[in-house]
Amino acid sequence: MRSLPAIYSLFFSICLSAQTYQPNWESLDNRPVPQWFKDAKFGIFIHWGVYAVPGWSSKGNYAEWYQNGLQTNDTARMRFHKAKFGDRSYYDLANDFKAELFNPDDWAKLFEKSGAKYIVLTSKHHDGFTLWPSKEADKTWGFKWNAADIGPKRDLLGDLFKAVRKTSVHAGMYYSLYEWFNPLWKTDKQKFVTEHTWPQMKDLINNYQPDVFWTDGDWDAPAETWKSQEFLAWLYNESPVKNKVVVNDRWGSGVRFNHGGIYSPEYQPDLDFETHDWEESRGMGYSYGYNREEDAWDYNSAQSLVIALIDKASRGGNFLLDIGPDEHGKIPPIMQERLLQIGEWLTINGEAIYNTRRWKTTSQWSAGRRDYKGGNEHITGDWKTGGDIMLKLTVDPDPGYAVKELFFTYNPAQNNLYVIFPKYPDNRKLTINNAELPAGTKISFLSTKENLVWNQNGSNVEINLPEFNPNKIKSPYAFAVKIENFGKYASRPQIKVEYMPGELRPTLSILSDAGTEIRYTDDGSDPGPNSALYTAPVVINKNSLIKAYSFFKNNSEKSLASSVALAEVKAYQWMNALKVSGPKAAINYRYYQPDANVDMGSINDKPDETGIADNISINLKKRKDKFAFDFSGYLKIEKDGLYSFYLESDDGSQLFVDNKEIINNGGYHGTVEKSGRAALKKGFHKIHVVYFDAGGENSLKVSIQPEGGIKQQISALFH
């Protein structure tokens, strides 16, 4: 008889094969993430290339960005390069990238022992150097720029894939769409995409058939330039990996966290995507590429990394942990040690991680403050005072602060709930708040496999743990208990809000699983068994905060009910058009480039430049970064209606219509799009957009969409 996982896998493959995807996000976003990836939870990122030769960056920076620093006047990298390599160019360093100690079978053995279920190797980073024999690389660069023709003179990607495929680990690859200084990219972007990027990607897919295709370097152009939708349609419909490949969301500026496959936060442990598959990546130190500047104390401890894995798994995500081999092909011993330590822990506790899903409650907090300001502690370079945010959140809190004392994961196939705790309680009692277990429920301790005694104390469950014995309890980075045949809960309802044509009041629909009952409130209070019963769509007459939850019709037990879904619902009022005398095309702008840090406070009455712009754009900036804009004028609306506005920016921005804030996309962040609505009468309306860039990459896009119409950038602007 076939096992259930095999049957699920076969069913999943049939479902994927039956679907034909169109080259648009609406269709592509419907492709489910392959089941194997959802079950895997832990992967290894590998950044390896010519940048391993210098293998250097100042602390708090990425060593794989070495070339970019050399060519953008990074004085620290330039000083290091001059001292070590003299007048040699970065391209000449490919001759020193020998990889003479690279043993792919040893790497594969290490990966399997680490407990990782997949790897993602950089087939090509932003410098354009490829780890496989790419004829496009040599052609567009005009010299040998791939590992088969220079340096190692071997197919590093192919050799590693062959070795990994002898193990239980899935083989995946990273691919940078963008190349910083590729001469073809700099002169003809469309030709670069059609004659370089696409042929390389198809070469990789057809010849290496990766289980993961992880793109990056997307920010410099929209998905339309990269022809990302067309490529994904081919990948999903026709490619040899159409049924198994996993992709991420880095397919063009503004796409990340909005479209594509899995969402891919990077050093963003606070981000959470409850309704979308995701994976957070990070290094063991800070750099992804090998950085000889980092010291032992710059690396996260094994406990910190195990807790990071637990944290991601408890919230339904995957953890992609990076290693950076050196130019000789050796993985630094400290990185090997960390991987083996994680593997040791997973050997004991892996069933609490693999094949699990997010439970209705992801963690349980102790008493205390939760307003941690958890920036990236590595950037300070002071491990003694910076601390480790994962450890502070769990085992080493600052005075007065709470910790996540319990994490929960759930295996739906087995109906088992796992409770993971990073700190062994002194009194050997584990308390699960707000849970009621059926009499006779079996609970076991994964470290020793022994059954545990428990009792129901009011609304809480108390579990008696064994005496802590280090001879029996190995790999004490965290501990787990299994609660058998318990944990199935009603799925959280989905709240859908629609505005019918010509209607400013929203229609509310709430969806949930068959066999469940939905109760909801419209005043922001938490719903309960006696709240309003949802039976059919309802029109909402005022601004409301809707909260809804579901529970099984034959069991309203709170611990098995769904988590609460919420939605802010607005009933809009018409905003009347303004009388504007002699409007002229274009919009006013004020430009700022202060000497100090840039934020919303930089926008004041003393601009560095003023003028008229054809559209709301940052193309008029006078320097690469650290600037701000203030746009003000009028927007012409052609007919009465409810309009959606979209504000996409890196960093912060705000949009106002008729002096009313419609969108607040403020703060320091990468490219993020937010939206808001306004009911506008035909005619002119004031529009005001403010924007700042605090440094690094920057972008701003303002779009409008009539109800039922097409989203497009705002063009009808006046002053």
Model-derived segments and spans:
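Short, compositionally stereotyped local motifs that mark structural "simplifiers"
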Residues: G487-A585, A596, E609-F629, F656-D658, ...
